[in-house]
Amino acid sequence: MTLIHPTAVIDPKAELDSSVKVGAYTVIGPNVQIGANTEIGPHAVINGHTSIGENNRIFQFASLGEIPQDKKYRDEPTKLIIGNGNTIREFTTFNLGTVTGIGETRIGDDNWIMAYCHLAHDCVVGNHTIFANNASLAGHVTIGDYVVLGGYTLVFQFCRIGDYAMTAFAAGVHKDVPPYFMASGYRAEPAGLNSEGMRRNGFTAEQISAVKDVYKTLYHRGIPFEEAKADILRHAETQAELAVFRDFFAQSARGIIR
């Protein structure tokens, strides 16, 4: 059985595993690498120095590896790197990185990216995330593991969203969202704990309670942020589920939602 449709346009220099399926009218550029058992639907365009792993499913009209929407970009050989087992739905756009950023845009494994989502230059997306339709990341955004972005979520440049966090429909994320927390609103504010997401991913009642105490410390005790952070970091020394806050606070450039 022919795995590549005869109307697909694939540069001879592109490197595709023999098991890759390519649909009608798809275009694949010379610097693209695609791993085993990845399936690409019709009318997709994959360009740039793009590496795609194994067992991905890319739907029709996806645009992957085009140049970043950055006026400073001067055709440098930056990259897009996509891991394994991802579902990338219709009309998604993933851009290359920039030399003023980390030089690459990275997507991990087992992510579910729904239609019309956009990942700008130098974004880093972890594993097992869900992006609902039309979620968009500006440049230099970092998304942790098991994050859920509601439809039409917009994330500002350089923001971070921590592991197991969740945003509501049309959230405008202008500051960092800590791990396990929910955020909602045009200028996103704290909206409680993603306790259901934690339960679904095997956290115990005791672990959820410990994270709930962190939420209360940050938002309900009425103490200054630096004092709240110090208290959380003390508890993180003995509670493994809180250790993620140590790195998150240390790497936060925009501050957290309040």
UniProtKB/Swiss-Prot annotation:
Q: Keyword Lipid metabolism, does the record have it?
A: yes
Extract the Gene3D superfamilies matched here.
Hexapeptide repeat proteins (2.160.10.10), Udp N-acetylglucosamine O-acyltransferase, C-terminal domain (1.20.1180.10)
Where's it mainly located? Answer: cytoplasm
Tagged with keyword Cytoplasm: yes
Keywords recorded for this protein, A-Z: Acyltransferase, Cytoplasm, Lipid A biosynthesis, Lipid biosynthesis, Lipid metabolism, Repeat, Transferase
Compartment list: Cytoplasm
Tell me its EC number(s), please.
Answer: 2.3.1.129
Q: Which GO terms describe its biological process?
A: lipid A biosynthetic process
Write out the function statement from the record. Involved in the biosynthesis of lipid A, a phosphorylated glycolipid that anchors the lipopolysaccharide to the outer membrane of the cell.
Query: What family, per the record?
Result: Belongs to the transferase hexapeptide repeat family. LpxA subfamily.
Q: What is this protein called?
A: Acyl-[acyl-carrier-protein]--UDP-N-acetylglucosamine O-acyltransferase
